[in-house]
Amino acid sequence: MNEYNFSDIEKSTQEYWRKNDTFKTIEDNTKEKFYCLSMLPYPSGTLHMGHVRNYTIGDVIARYQKMQGKNVLHPMGWDAFGLPAENAAIKHKKSPYEWTKSNIAYMRSQFDSLGFSFDWSREITTCDEDYYKWEQWFFIQLYKKGLAYRKNSVVNWDPVDQTVLANEQVVDGRGWRSGALVEKKEIPQWFLKITDYADELLQDINKLDNWPEAVKTMQINWIGKSKGLTVKFKVKDSNQEIEVFTTRPDTLMGVNYLGIAPEHPLALKEAKSNSQLAAFIEECKKTSTMEADLATQEKKGFKTSIKVIHPISAETIDVWVANFVLMGYGSGAVMSVPAHDQRDWEFAQKYNIPLKQVIESNDNKLKIDLEKQAFTEKGILINSGEFDGLNFKNAYQAIKKYLTEQNKGYETTNFRIHDWGISRQRYWGCPIPMIHCDDCGAVPEKEENLPVRLPTDVALTEAGSPLKDIPEFINVACPECGKPAKRETDTFDTFFESSWYYARYTCPTANQMLDQEANYWLPVDKYIGGIEHAIMHLLYARFFHKLMRDQGLVKSDEPFKNLLTQGMVLKDGAKMSKSKGNIVDPQELIDKYGADTVRLFSMFAAPPEQSLEWSETGVEGANKFLRKVFNYAELNKVIFAKNITLESQKLTKEDKKARFEIHSNLKQAIFDFDKSQFNTVVSACMKILNTLNNYDNLSESVKVEGFSILLRILAPFTPHLCHYLWQQLNLGEDILHTSFPTVDNNALEKDEFLLVVQINGKLKAKLELDASLSSNQVEEVVLADEHVKSFIDNKQVVKVIYVPQKLINIVIK
C-alpha cells in the first residue's frame, strides 16, 4: 500500500492548477457571482500563523462557493507603501521598492505552497504606478468638489517616525508603529471631508446586517453623533465670543468656569505675555490627545486673565487653559459644571473651584453628596432662576428658546468624528498630486501628467522625507500660470491605498480608475480580516465607496456585504510575537506535515471568530486524520475502478444505517459551511470517515458514495489531497469544478429507530423498532417485550408516556 506523500501530492496538484489556470476568473452573467476577499497583507517578508489562518478561511469560503456553482472572484495583492518598508530599507541599505518586491516574491511563493486559490492575474501592488495613478486622479476629483482641502492643523506628531498620525493611529499615547510618545504640533495638512458623509456612514450601518455587532457598535461610537446646543459666552471687555457645545444645557446655570485648549487662539495670545502659561502650553504638547488617555491622565490647568459673561445670568466666569480640552473638537472650548460632570469635578477639587448644584434627583430619597463626587444624572433644575422645577426635556427646550431668541446660542448636531488627515511626511508613499504657486495657491497637477511618480534615486534617512531635498521633484511650473512653483512633498496616508483596492481588483488593468466590471462584482460578498480594523480601514473603505458612488464609479452604497472578523492565533495564551519568543514558523510546519495539514488544523482548532490556541498535538491530529483518508482510498481503490452506482432497493440494513449517518453529517456540514463554522464542518468529515470504517459489511456502492461525499466536503480545507484522490479514484478531473454534494432526504428516513425504555424514569432497556409503527403499536410491543415484562409483572401500570421514536416511560406502582 502506498504511503501518504504530501510533498509529491501538493507539488503535482499545484502544477496542475498552474498549467490549467484553474483560479482565473472572468465575468460570466450566466452565473451567480461571489466575491470573496481577505484583507491584503503588508509584504513583511514572511507569512506568520495569523496570515495562514486568515487566508485559509477565505480560501475555504471561495472554494466552497465555487463548488456551489458560483462565479467566484478571489484575488490577492499587497499593501506595499508605508513606514515599515522605508525603515527596513534604511536598515538594510536597499531601496524600499527593491525590499518590497523581494518580499512580495517570497510571500507569493508561500501563498502558492499553501494552495490558496488566488487569481494572480488580478494581483495589485499599491506602490505600482498603475495603481496609485488612479488614486491621484481620484484625489484631484475630490479636490475639485471641495471634498479635499489643506489647512493648518494641530496634529499628532511621531518624533521617531517623523510623521503625522491620525487619532486612530495613536495607541495609549504612543505611535502605533514606533511606540514613541506622541507630541502635538501645528503644520499644514491635507484632509478629506469624511464629516460630510458622517450622517450617511452612521445611517447605513443599519444596512450591514451581516457584520459583527461589535464592529458596528465601534463605528457608531467613533462617528459619535449627538444633538445639543452651541452656547455663546461673550469675552469680557471684548467683541469676541467663545462658543461651546453641550448635550446638557440643563446644567448651564451651574457653569463655574470655561476650559479652552492649549492651542486655542486666546490662550496663545495671552501666552505671549505670560511665560508661565507659555511653559504650560509646551508641557501640554507632550501629552496624549487620545480620549481614552485624556480620561485617565492627571487633569491640569492654568487660570488665565480672560473672563467671559454667562449668557443667561450675566455672571463673570473664569477661563482656564486645560490639558483635557482638544482644539480639534468643536471650537476648542468646553463649559465646565463641576457639580454635574465628574471630570470637571476632579479639576475643581484640584484647583479649589467652587461648585454650584443646579440639578437635584427625581428621587427625593436620594442624598446627593457633592463632597464625594459629581451628580451626573438628569433630574429637576434648582438654583436656575426661571428654569427651576423643569425636568431635562422641558429645560432643554426652554433654554434653547431663550438662547435662540437672544442670539446667544443655537441647536447643533455634533459629531465625534473629524475630517481625515491624509498627509504623511515620509518618502515611501503615494505623492499627493498638488502644486503650490505663490500666485495661484494650491493647484492640482494636470491629469495628463499623472502619475506624479515617486523618485527612486533618493538618499533615505530616519529624519523625515527626502523628497523636499530633490530639486527636480520639487521645482515645477504652475499648471495654471506657468510660473515657478513647488510640488507638494507630503505623501498619502497608506489607508488611502487600502480604502479602494477591493474595487480595483475587479478591473486591475483598466485604463481608468474603475470600469463596468466593478458593478458586476461589487459589493464584496464576504470580507475577512481582523476586528482591529473596525474604525480605521473599515470606516475609511465605507467612506471611499460612497465617494466613488457619487463620482459615478460604482452603483452600490456599501463595499462589503458580509464581514467575518477572525480571532488571533495564540501560543501559551499570548498573541504570537518575536518579542515574546513564541513564534511558530508556518514554513517549518508545511515542510514537516504538508500544507493540507496546516490548513486543516487552523480550521479545526477553533471557530473562525474565536482565538486559536496553537497546539503541536492538534497539528499531529490533523495529519493523522489525513493519513486515514489517504489509507481508506488506498484500501478501496479497486472498488472505485468498477464504476458502481447506488441501487436503493439492494441496500442492506447496515447500508441504510451508514447512509443515514453520512447524509446527516452532510446536512450538518452544509448548514455549518453557510454559517462559517468550519471547525464543525471538519468534525462532520471525521464522523463520515468513522462511519465508513466502523461498518464491516458495507456495500461497495455505499463506500463509493460516502467517500466521494467526504472528499467534496473536505476539498475546500485540504485541496491538494482531495484533488489527488479524486483523480486517482477516477471520480473526475478536477474536484474544484465538481458540484458540492446534496443531501438525499430518503437516506434520512429510518426504517428502524432505537427506543429508550424507562420504568419510573429509570433506564431499563433499548429496543430496535420498526419506524412504521403507530404510538399504540409501539406501546403494545414494549409491554410485550420479555425483558420489560420482568419489571412490570404483578405491578399496576399507571400511565405510559411516549416521546415518538425516542423514549417511552412506563409509570408503575
From Swiss-Prot:
Pfam families: Anticodon_1, tRNA-synt_1, tRNA-synt_1_2, tRNA-synt_1g. Signal peptide: none annotated. Its EC number is 6.1.1.4. CDD domains: Anticodon_Ia_Leu_BEm, LeuRS_core. Coiled coil: none annotated. PROSITE patterns: AA_TRNA_LIGASE_I. A motif ('KMSKS' region) lies at residues 575-579. Keywords: Aminoacyl-tRNA synthetase, ATP-binding, Cytoplasm, Ligase, Nucleotide-binding, Protein biosynthesis. One of its GO terms (biological process) is leucyl-tRNA aminoacylation. Its main location: cytoplasm. PANTHER family: LEUCINE--TRNA LIGASE, MITOCHONDRIAL, LEUCYL-TRNA SYNTHETASE. Belongs to the class-I aminoacyl-tRNA synthetase family. HAMAP family: Leu_tRNA_synth_B. This is Leucine--tRNA ligase. It comes from Francisella tularensis subsp. tularensis (strain SCHU S4 / Schu 4). The gene is leuS.
